[in-house]
């Protein structure tokens, strides 16, 4: 034994104290939990993630709640029994296409609980899935605790809707929510419902799964821009973005009219956040925290400047995995018996102690290791896509949407086009005196005098698809003809998706048409702004010709759609 080791030094120190008359003071009472030696508040130690898990679960539950709320309010009109693209027709067509496959093969290719349900009342099925999701997500959001079963239920319920949602659920944030939700399953113990499950510390593998997710999201978004539209390289994209984004809000109106140098600064800042900051994740604790702060602030700016559904709120969730308990402690109250106090006590208990092996812990550790191996394996095509000069964005490589590619605004439209639906009560649609009246949607631009909407994190799926439809033809979007037919019949479900029906309290229109317009923000202080107009619009031409109910009868039957209203 070394002579300068602690065990040899202790007797010598004791002997010196006796020779000099020094005596040990009376032992002091240990400080109260959550307090320092002088009674000051104790600080949480770094390296544990008990509070991080609570914040992660609450944030994820909030996004789930919004997603299921959107589903409950809009699914019947979009994919219900008489929806614009009924999911029953979609499921039957899928079943017929794979009629030579086993039921398990069909289910594994497109997993959804709806395969196991009665299709005679699809509206009730869709409502049931959405209400279950709302109930479970509300519980997790309020309590901050969950187990693997509850989180798996949320993931399975939402995946069941995404896989039958057709184009209405084709946005990149659907897969992103499913991947985030899948990781959320492994944050929790199997059975225990506790905010601080003592024997189930937050898995480092799961935390790195979240960090790997935010790394891919941000780097993928940055690379798709640099490889995509030239305006990202010459720093001019922000000259157009606020005006041409899918659903502008009032702040976007003013940001669009910012000085040119401010737009250049925005674009450079975007490249810094998306291309350089993601690598902070691998540079130690402090750099990782800086990464999390910058990403959350960046998403907050995007929320303020546009209505991008719950995408930016969702992107904040994996960023929270950058923070440990010491970083997030300020979010929780102090005091005896508080969560922070209990975490501090748990940190003291486990410091230097070796936990006794438990069967549940062993099983969970094996599950986490398996998760890590699975994520690594499924990441191979994703990494190859990131490195490819032909990078694709918002693509999933498996039916479970576990590891996906991401990206946004790889190209920026320089002009804003809108499809305006109009109806007339005139018996002759081509008559010069036919009076055409506009239908107004809940959020997308229509009436130039209407203030842009402010709805984030909520999401109007029809309005978003109308934005995409304006860049294509109606032949590529047959659902818009279905919508026209429903407007001709004054269908209540379809009208609930709109903000204004010009024929309310009157007989339905005899004809409905689609008109193509170009929209630009009015200039602050200009003539149009003085008239109260946010937009200036100019007609491009017809989007689809005037249609009547009788003309649409064979069109509906060929697609298996129920005939609307009086037909």
Swiss-Prot record:
It is a multi-pass membrane protein. Residues 73-127, 222-292, 389-567 are lumenal. It is found in: Endoplasmic reticulum membrane. It comes from the Eukaryota. GO terms for cellular component: endoplasmic reticulum membrane. It holds the Pfam family LMF1_C. Keywords: Chaperone, Endoplasmic reticulum, Membrane, Transmembrane, Transmembrane helix. Residues 1-39 are annotated as: Disordered. Residues 1-49, 152-207, 322-367 are cytoplasmic. Signal peptide: none annotated. GO terms for biological process: chylomicron remnant clearance; endoplasmic reticulum to Golgi vesicle-mediated transport; protein glycosylation; protein maturation; protein secretion; regulation of cholesterol metabolic process; regulation of triglyceride metabolic process; triglyceride metabolic process. InterPro entries: LMF (IPR009613). The chain crosses the membrane at residues 50-72, 128-151, 208-221, 293-321, 368-388. It is linked to Combined lipase deficiency: Characterized by repeated episodes of pancreatitis, tuberous xanthomas and lipodystrophy and is caused by deficiency of both lipoprotein lipase (LPL) and hepatic triglyceride lipase (HTGL). Involved in the maturation of specific proteins in the endoplasmic reticulum. Required for maturation and transport of active lipoprotein lipase (LPL) through the secretory pathway. Each LMF1 molecule chaperones 50 or more molecules of LPL. Belongs to the lipase maturation factor family. Interacts with LPL and SEL1L. This is Lipase maturation factor 1. It comes from Homo sapiens. The gene is LMF1.
